[in-house]
Amino acid sequence: MCTNIVYEWLRALQLPQYAESFVDNGYDDLEVCKQIGDPDLDAIGVLAPAHRRRILEAVHRLREQDAAAAGLYFTLEPQPVPPAPLVEAVPPGRRGEPCGSSAQGTRGDPRGQPGAPCSRELVSYPKLKLKIMIRDKLVRDGIHLSKPPYSRKVPMAGILEYLMNWPKSSQNH
């Protein structure tokens, strides 16, 4: 029997009898299973209408989860230049607040402003703005990347001693 994520998914749907057929037809990953439709279920051999309905509903839920998670990713691309100059003063607020929170929106991000619609679409940040946002978040959370456990200092004396003995150690090999 196949023991993978698709088997576990089908077992959760109480349809583990189709696991082998899924894998045999190339549906061995949930990413691939998100593309399943009626013709695919015919090829897999899912003939019972109740089973087909359960699988198609689960596929729909997988797609919804994937769409909801899409807002969590970002890319480092320059923002397109607006066609007309938009000058709008947005007071600096706390970054990283979820949509609909009581805090004011982030600078230049109209999604975080009060009254703005809460959307989960992909947002691109300029590289410099993203660096500033990350730096501010680290400072706010009290994280110092130059201190343990995030970094480990190598003693300089050890490096100098190694370099001074380097010609000797290379002759031994």
Curated annotation (Swiss-Prot):
Residues 1-65 form the SAM domain. PROSITE patterns: SAM_DOMAIN (PS50105). Residues 89-120 are annotated as: Disordered. GO terms for cellular component: cytoplasm. The keyword Transmembrane helix does not apply. InterPro entries: SAM, SAM-SH3_domain_protein, SAM/pointed_sf. CDD domains: SAM_Samd5 (cd09527). This is Sterile alpha motif domain-containing protein 5. It comes from Mus musculus (Mouse).
